[in-house]
Regions:
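A short, conserved alpha-helix in the catalytic core of glycosyltransferases
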Residues: 161-170, 174-180, 184-212
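Glycine-rich, basic loop-to-helix element that forms the pyrophosphate-binding segment
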Residues: 62-82
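Short beta-strand/loop segment that forms part of the nucleotide-sugar
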Residues: 33-41, 60-62
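Short beta-strand-to-loop acidic/aromatic patch adjacent to the donor-nucleotide binding site
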Residues: 84-95
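Conserved donor NDP-sugar-binding/catalytic core segment of glycosyltransferases
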Residues: 94-128, 133-135
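Short, flexible, basic/aromatic active-site loop/helix in glycosyltransferases
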Residues: 135-161
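Short, acidic, metal-binding catalytic loop of nucleotide-sugar glycosyltransferases
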Residues: 23-32
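Non-catalytic, C-terminal membrane-associated alpha-helical segments of glycosyltransferases
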Residues: 228-236, 246-297
Length: 297
């Protein structure tokens, strides 16, 4: 019998993405999966719509916005109780190729964590994620695109140091060793943190070129520069640097200074609106104010 995959979806007002997503799930060649739908107090009717439409899924509706990290952990705990073999963390603003789950499971043997090729356009012209690596100098990650793939002539499956939280398949035994997502991030940089923890535990991470999906980049704020992303990117990057200072090559104090110089002191006319939120991110990091921000975004 094929191994069981529990797909964890964290939803916040994702109504406009559900039909496309659900249609692609129905077409999967791999059928031994269960969806765990965790809703963070949506107000657009998406939780009720999903629950009534996909009755075989497990729907968990929270009364507050618990964030991506906490939402994933709720789904992960459910999967563990059900003795899942794998957990697939997946963004709801995606459309999957028919063989996505099948290919990921195939290449995850040996307790690997794997991520697929991710397109940013429906016509599959632009690759948004073609594998990635963490930069231990800056605390940021690089996602490889078409030009890197062609130049390096990558195989179907190659090792990476950053797996994308948009879609990552994790063997349940790895989760038991490494743990779930760090909820102090709330959103953003939680996948960077997981990637570093995988590395510290000796878990191999791989990019699977033969497995792909379309990510409607921006559906979960990804790809959008706004006051919300500027705050969380600033605060969480510094937290990541401090938490993993044992393997980082730059002091988080130095990174904080560089962020201030680049985004506050040298901010252009179009970026001055972000200055209060960058400063708030720096301040909240230093006073240890993590989790969901009290900022009114």
């Amino acid at each position: 019998m094929s191994k069981s995959v529990y797909i964890v979806l964290v939803n916040y007002n994702g109504m406009k993405y559900l039909d496309d997503f659900m249609d692609s799930m129905h077409k999967q060649t791999y059928t031994n999966y269960k969806i765990v739908f965790v809703d963070s107090a949506s107000t657009d009717g998406s939780a009720e719509y999903f629950k009534n439409t996909w009755t075989e899924a497990k729907t968990i509706i929270k009364k507050e916005n618990v964030g991506f990290a906490r939402g994933c952990n709720i789904g992960i705990e459910y999967a563990k109780r059900k003795k899942a073999d794998y957990v697939l963390l997946l963004n709801i603003d995606t459309v999957l190729d028919n063989n996505l789950i099948e290919e990921l499971v195939k290449y995850s043997e040996g307790e690997r964590v794997v991520s697929p090729k991710i397109y940013s356009t429906r016509d599959k012209v632009d690759i948004w994620y073609g594998g990635g690596d963490l930069n231990y100098e800056t605390g940021c990650h690089a996602q490889y695109h078409d030009e890197r793939l062609e130049k390096e002539n990558f195989d179907l499956c190659h090792e990476i140091t950053f797996v994308s939280g948009c879609c990552m398949l994790i063997p349940i035994e790895v989760i038991k060793r490494v743990g779930g997502l760090d909820e102090k991030y709330f959103m953003y940089y939680d996948d960077d943190d997981m990637s570093l923890r995988f590395r510290k535990e000796g878990v191999e991470m791989r990019y699977i070129y033969s497995s792909s999906l379309w990510h409607k980049v921006g559906g979960s704020y990804a790809g959008k520069k706004n006051i919300l992303t500027e705050y969380y990117f600033t605060r969480n990057r510094l937290y990541l640097m401090k938490k993993h200072k044992d393997i980082m090559r730059t002091s988080y104090h130095k990174i904080a200074k560089e962020i201030f110089e680049q985004k506050v002191y040298k901010a252009g006319a179009n970026d001055k609106q972000y200055i209060p939120y960058v400063l708030r991110g720096i301040c909240d990091f230093y006073i240890g104010k993590m989790g969901k921000s009290s900022c009114k975004f």
